[in-house]
Amino acid sequence: MMDLDNIPDTQTEAEELEEVVMGLIINSGQARSLAYAALKQAKQGDFAAAKAMMDQSRMALNEAHLVQTKLIEGDAGEGKMKVLVHAQDHLMTSMLARELITELIELHEKLKA
């Protein structure tokens, strides 16, 4: 992995940076997918599986958030990372989905109790 404290000036470093940003997008997407899979399990009454999937979702989201924080710190407002906006969108929608799905799972648990 490249040094996220220094934003690249060369094409090779830019390609490495894009790879890191893609990792942010992938982790965010994985977090969202796991959260929706957890909701499906909760709707079927399998709350243990739902909890396990939400734990996995949280870990993927934490990884994505860590990368995002380092990228933002490294860019220092210079706008060198065009794809970062797309990556941030993935992260924020994943965070929102996870929060809402947590609430929905709790509602399903109460309804099935």
Regions found by a protein language model. Name each.
Residues M2-A113:
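Terminal alpha-helical segments
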